[in-house]
């Protein structure tokens, strides 16, 4: 361990001048390929020669092409499953007709025989989808809007009634709703106009004083009772013969209570 350089592959040589030179081991001789194996290297570089060799039917190249084809199929299936499940760049059947799909599938089969490298087939595999998957997607797309339209249809239309009858029924229902809304608006406006006219006839602190409908009714009742007392008439429900002063006091108390409630709301 003291002199590690003695065991190293490099040898130190002392020259005449005293300088030390390092001598490395000679590299291993380069192995040249024999002429027997040269056609195989040339074959993998040129795909046309590969196709011709496969056509000749030599056993070694046939076995090699079968291995490459099996690897190509396995890699292709994995890539196809991944690409189709992720639903990226899905091809719709409406955009691609059946004739184009068949031509694409035939080209893919031919390319598997011609191309010797599996990497090229892997890159081109995600662009072509099986015909069965495209047909299934076409059926699903055609069935989806049909089911939605059936759910959207009314029960009467599904029962077999013509579209004209359904349209007429809807028009009649809309007319009835419009008439009912008009009657309700007329009733509300009539009641409001009657209370406004009564408010102008009953006594109040000012002509423009705002009173609720309940206050207007109370003041109107007491006002009528007070006028009846002046005419020596008794309009009380229990016939207790209220005096004119009591009727005026009730009107005054109602007006005061209404004024206080309005101030609290403001």
Curated annotation (Swiss-Prot):
The UniProt record lists the keyword Transcription: yes
Protein name (database record): Transcription factor atoh8
Start and end residues of each stretch annotated as Disordered: 140-164
GO cellular component assignments: cytoplasm; nuclear speck; nucleus
bHLH domain: residues covered: 175-227
Role description: Transcription factor that binds a palindromic (canonical) core consensus DNA sequence 5'-CANNTG- 3' known as an E-box element, possibly as a heterodimer with other bHLH proteins. During development, is required for heart looping and swim bladder formation by acting in concert with GATA4 and ZFPM1. During the development of both the retina and skeletal muscles is required for neural retinal cell through modulating PAX6 and NEUROG3 expression and myogenic differentiation.
SMART domains the UniProt entry points to: HLH
Protein keywords: Cytoplasm, Developmental protein, Differentiation, DNA-binding, Neurogenesis, Nucleus, Transcription, Transcription regulation
InterPro entries listed in its UniProt record: ATOH8_bHLH, bHLH_dom, bHLH_transcription_factors, HLH_DNA-bd_sf
GO BP annotation list: anatomical structure morphogenesis; cell differentiation; heart development; heart looping; nervous system development; positive regulation of transcription by RNA polymerase II; regulation of neural retina development; regulation of skeletal muscle cell differentiation
UniProt-annotated location(s): Nucleus; Nucleus speckle; Cytoplasm
Disruption phenotype: Morpholino knockdown of atoh8 causes two phenotypes. The severe phenotype displays a shrunken head, reduced eye size and fused somites and most embryos die within 3 days. The mild phenotype displays an abnormal brain shape with smaller eyes, a curved body axis with indistinct somite boundaries and frequently reduced or no circulation. In addition, the yolk extension is hardly visible starting at the beginning of tail straightening from the 17-somite stage.
Helix-loop-helix motif as annotated region, ranges: 189-227
Disulfide bridge map: none
PANTHER family: BASIC HELIX-LOOP-HELIX PROTEIN NEUROGENIN-RELATED, TRANSCRIPTION FACTOR ATOH8
Chain segments annotated as transmembrane: none
Region (Basic motif): 175-188
Gene Ontology MF annotations: DNA-binding transcription factor activity; E-box binding; protein dimerization activity
Principal location class: nucleus
Organismal lineage: Eukaryota, Metazoa, Chordata, Craniata, Vertebrata
Cross-referenced Pfam families: HLH
Native source species: Danio rerio (Zebrafish)
Biased composition (Basic and acidic residues): 150-160
